[in-house]
């Protein structure tokens, strides 16, 4: 019996030491994640190592998408500080596009998109997680029937081929999953999800999942972003994308995030720059909030320096614990004068406006871990008109919301505190 235990103990100790070595010297975790995984490995030896391989290990993604990063840089071209709205982090940051028009069309975006799809003459490129059967898929099938090149790049969860995708493919369109179905079938990790949701029509009109409609040269840049992802997934030779004529006076910069941007964190840099450069106001609406020392430090410093910082979150998140964790993470911000509101409305993407003229949109929440681990497409737009529309939309949410204060946080019941404590245990599973 003693010998049997010794035979089992040695491999377990070796596996744990390997896991601890990888966490200490190879992974790039934030302090909370680092401590969490270290505790799991120490106190749950066998389960901890298996859990680390399935949910915690990021080394495979870094190696797997490094080839994509190199090919993306070759296709998208270099970025310089002179041609950027934000401090340059070359990985993921595209060149600035001048002469664009940008509109917020959240309420009737489907009607606008259908009208533009019906007017398509050459190409429609759509990148999304899932395309269900509906009005959009029907219009895409009609476009493919009349000879428009329709390409759809979908997420791998569900293997991409939904009823809507099958309709488009049957009509002559093409569709492929972003990643291999084999990897999707055996991957249980809550990362490397496709959050790039946008559509480009004739390289002149484009739509973002956050409800932004764009006209002008930036649509061509989004076309090249799609081309980089399509080439990686399909192995096809990249096609050229025509640059459309100027359509307005907005400067737009595309910022990509995810495992194919291994050098730096471009999306984090985007939001940190916006927060730190705000002189008067910064308004943010996002699905939920998680602790992030650097970003929170910037928000607190700006608030204490006199900048009016306002943040809006939904009362009902996708997961039950996100609302409670947002309240916990917001406590330190409240202590520094940040205004926090909870709305009954649905907030599925992040929008931020700095000083009424510079705005940013992202399909992801303000979770720096998700911004590094999930694929996303983000925009930085210099436009008083678009910024005003976003501020008005967020202002409407604030008007119908309840302001969350320190008094609200301190007045929690004993049962509330138990629920908050339980929710914090799920903080790293977003």
Residue ranges and their predicted role:
Residues 116-122, 272-283:
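Secondary-structure "cap/kink" motif recognition
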């Amino acid at each position: 019996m003693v010998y049997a235990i010794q035979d089992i103990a040695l491999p377990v100790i070796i596996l744990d030491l390997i896991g601890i070595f990888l966490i200490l010297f190879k992974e790039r975790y934030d302090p909370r994640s680092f401590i969490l995984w270290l505790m799991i490995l120490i106190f749950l030896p066998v389960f901890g190592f298996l859990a680390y391989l399935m949910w915690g290990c990021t080394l495979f993604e870094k190696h797997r998408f490094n080839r994509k990063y190199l090919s993306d840089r070759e296709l998208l071209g270099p970025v310089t500080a002179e041609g950027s709205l934000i401090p340059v982090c070359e990985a993921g940051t595209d060149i600035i596009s001048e002469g664009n028009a940008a509109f917020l069309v959240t309420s009737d975006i489907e009607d606008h998109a259908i009208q533009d799809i019906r007017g398509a003459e050459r190409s429609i490129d759509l990148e999304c997680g899932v395309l269900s059967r509906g009005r959009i898929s029907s219009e895409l099938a009609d476009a493919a029937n009349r000879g428009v090149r329709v390409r759809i790049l979908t997420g791998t969860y569900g293997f991409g081929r939904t009823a809507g995708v099958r309709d488009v493919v049957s009509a002559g369109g093409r569709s492929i999953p972003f990643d291999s179905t084999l990897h999707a079938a055996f991957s249980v990790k809550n990362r490397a999800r496709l959050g790039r949701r946008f559509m480009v029509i004739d390289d002149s009109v484009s739509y973002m999942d956050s409800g932004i409609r764009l006209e002008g040269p930036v649509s061509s840049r989004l076309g090249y972003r799609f081309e980089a992802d399509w080439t990686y997934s399909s192995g096809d030779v990249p096609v050229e994308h025509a640059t459309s004529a100027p359509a307005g006076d907005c400067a737009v910069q595309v910022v990509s995030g995810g495992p194919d941007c291994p050098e730096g964190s471009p999306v984090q840099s985007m939001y940190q720059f916006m927060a730190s450069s705000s002189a008067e106001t910064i308004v943010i609406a996002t699905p939920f909030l998680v602790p992030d020392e650097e970003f929170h430090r910037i928000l607190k410093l700006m608030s204490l320096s006199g900048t009016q910082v306002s943040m809006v979150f939904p009362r009902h998140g996708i997961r039950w614990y996100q609302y409670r964790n947002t309240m916990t993470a917001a406590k330190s911000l409240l202590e520094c004068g940040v205004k926090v509101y909870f709305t009954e409305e649905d907030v599925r993407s992040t929008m931020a406006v700095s000083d009424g003229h510079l705005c940013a949109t992202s399909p992801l929440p303000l979770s720096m871990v998700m911004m590094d681990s999930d694929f996303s497409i983000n925009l930085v737009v210099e436009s008083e008109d678009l910024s005003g529309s976003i501020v008005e939309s967020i202002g409407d949410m604030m008007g119908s919301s309840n302001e969350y204060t320190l008094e609200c946080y301190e007045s929690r019941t004993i049962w509330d505190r138990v629920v908050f404590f339980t929710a914090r245990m799920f903080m790293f599973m977003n």
